[in-house]
A protein has these predicted regions:
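N-terminal hydrophobic/helix-forming segments and targeting peptides
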Residues: 1-336
Length: 336
C-alpha cells in the first residue's frame, strides 16, 4: 500500500455518519487479496475476516465517518443555515464546503458571516454560533438543496516529510493501520482468526461498532482511533508524534489486553506511549465492551482534531501496524 496516496484518497472521500459508501469502496479495494471474507452489513460497516487456526477471535474497529454539517434551513435570501456534527463553530468563517444534494450532485459554497464593519461592538466580541453563520452558494435557484442535505469541508490534503495534513484523518488513518496490519499478517502465523470492521456512525455514538461486535461475538476487541498529540501543555498527557502508538490503560480497557500490547511492544523494540483512561474512552471500545468483549484501545497521535486540517505522522501508522500484527501473532487460546 502507498500510505500517502491512500491517505489522500481517504481524506478527499465523502463519508458523513450513515453515508460512508465512498470510503467503504476504497477500503474494500485496499483489503483485496489480504482477507478471506469481505462484506457490508446492514449498519454500513465493511467487515473483513482473515482466518488463522480458529483458536479464538480478535476484532479491530476503525470508523469511516467524518465530522460534517447538515443544512438546517434554506433562507429566502438565498443562503443556507447549518447544524454541526462534531465541528468546532469557531473555525468555520471563510471555509470552503461541499453541499451534497439528495440527487447526488455536489455544489460548492463558502461559510460566511456578517463583515466586521457591519457588526456592533457587542457582536464583535461574541464567539460565533451556528446562528451567526450561513453558506453562500451564489445561486438563484435553490430547488435542488433540501433541509437535511449533508455539508462537508472542501479542502486539499497535503504532506510534508513524514507528516500528512487533511480532513477526516479521524479516523480513516486508523483504517489504513488495519490494512497495513493485514499486509504484515500475510507473513506471520496466527492462531486467532482476525475480524475487522471499518465502522460506521462513530461520530454520533459508535453505533456501527456495536452492531458489528454483537454480530461477530469476538473474544477480544480493539478500537483504533486518534488521540490528541499534545507536545507542549503540562496539563494533558504528553502524546507525541514519532513516538509510536498510544495504548490506553484505565477503567474500560481490559487490563490483560493493555498489558499484552505493552509487552509485545517491549519485546519487539516498538516505541509506544501510555494514555490514562479513567472513564469512557470516547471510541468504538465504549460500545464493543458492552457485548462482554475483552476490549482495548490503541490510538494514533493527531493534532487539530475535528478541524479541516488534521495532522498525523506516517511513522506512527507504520509502528502501530507492526505492533498489532505482532500482538495478533502472540495471541494464544485462553489468553482472556
Amino acid at each position: 500500500m502507498d500510505t500517502f496516496a491512500a491517505l489522500k484518497s481517504l481524506s478527499l472521500a465523502y463519508g458523513p455518519p450513515g453515508r460512508e459508501k465512498e470510503v467503504r469502496g476504497l477500503f474494500k479495494g485496499y483489503v483485496n487479496g489480504l482477507v478471506d471474507e469481505v462484506f457490508e452489513d446492514t449498519s454500513g460497516n465493511l467487515i473483513v475476516k482473515r482466518y488463522g487456526q480458529h483458536k479464538g477471535t480478535v476484532f479491530f474497529s476503525a470508523h469511516m465517518d467524518e465530522v460534517c454539517f447538515l443544512v438546517s434551513k434554506v433562507l429566502p435570501e438565498g443562503f443556507l443555515r447549518l447544524e454541526g456534527i462534531g465541528a468546532d463553530v469557531k473555525l468555520l468563517p471563510s471555509q470552503k464546503v461541499w453541499i451534497h444534494t439528495r440527487s447526488g450532485k455536489r455544489l460548492r459554497g463558502v461559510i460566511g458571516m456578517l463583515a466586521p464593519h457591519l457588526q456592533t461592538e457587542e457582536t464583535r466580541k461574541k464567539l460565533n454560533g451556528f446562528e451567526d453563520l450561513f453558506v453562500d452558494v451564489s445561486m438563484s435557484d435553490f430547488s435542488e438543496i433540501s433541509v437535511g442535505d449533508f455539508v462537508t469541508y472542501d479542502n486539499e490534503p497535503f504532506s510534508t516529510g513524514d507528516f500528512f495534513f487533511g480532513k477526516s484523518l479521524d479516523d480513516r488513518a486508523c483504517g489504513v493501520i488495519i490494512v497495513k496490519m493485514l499486509e504484515r499478517l500475510t507473513a506471520l502465523r496466527h492462531d486467532f482468526d482476525v475480524f475487522a470492521a471499518f465502522s460506521s456512525r462513530e461520530e454520533i455514538g459508535a453505533f456501527g461498532a456495536r452492531t458489528a461486535a454483537y454480530a461477530l461475538q469476538p473474544d477480544i476487541g480493539i478500537a483504533l482511533d486518534v488521540t490528541h498529540a499534545i507536545d507542549t501543555s503540562p496539563n494533558y498527557p504528553k502524546n507525541e508524534f514519532g513516538k509510536g502508538p498510544v495504548i490506553a490503560v484505565g477503567a474500560i480497557p481490559h487490563r490483560k489486553i493493555s498489558n499484552l500490547l505493552i509487552e509485545t511492544a517491549k519485546q519487539n523494540g516498538i516505541p509506544y506511549q501510555i494514555e490514562p483512561s479513567p472513564s469512557r474512552t470516547g471510541t468504538d471500545t465504549d460500545q464493543i465492551q458492552l457485548e462482554t468483549v475483552a476490549a482495548g484501545v490503541v490510538s494514533l497521535p493527531l493534532r487539530y482534531m475535528h478541524t479541516p486540517y488534521e495532522q498525523i505522522c506516517v511513522k506512527d501508522i507504520d509502528e502501530t501496524a507492526r505492533l498489532l500484527a505482532l500482538f495478533v501473532s502472540a495471541l494464544k487460546e485462553g489468553v482472556v
